[in-house]
Amino acid sequence: MGRYSGDPVRNHALRHSARNGSSGTRLYIGTPDEPPSEALLNCVRELSRRSLVISAAYAFNMAVGDNLPSLSIGLYFDTKPNLREVEELFRQFGRNIRPLISDINFVDLLPLDPSNLLGVAVRAQIKPFYRRVVQ
């Protein structure tokens, strides 16, 4: 949904399983060897806390087909989110995380929900770095 210049990811081998997407393309998801900076994770945590529609956030490497893996931040929604709402949230996230990542690398910001394969796969394989606490 959004790509922002970001922290370096040097992991070229993913440790988790591959899945076939609906088009037959292999999708590889894994834990980064070098996690994103704590400043970046804290920024995403704080922004996620402010949004009632985000229930969890995940940092993972993802590769599609034969492409090299890239760092992704997945924001998990309990239900399929409204596109306008996601676009506004991602603009806000982009403005806030851009200063925390270098100019030569990038971070993919992705919406995750129970209705898409990526959301199901990430939730099954990656531990969230943020989880909404309901009181």
Question: Predicted segment positions?
Answer:
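A contiguous, surface-oriented mixed alpha/beta subdomain in the mid-to-C-terminal portion of proteins
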Residues: 2-125, 130, 135
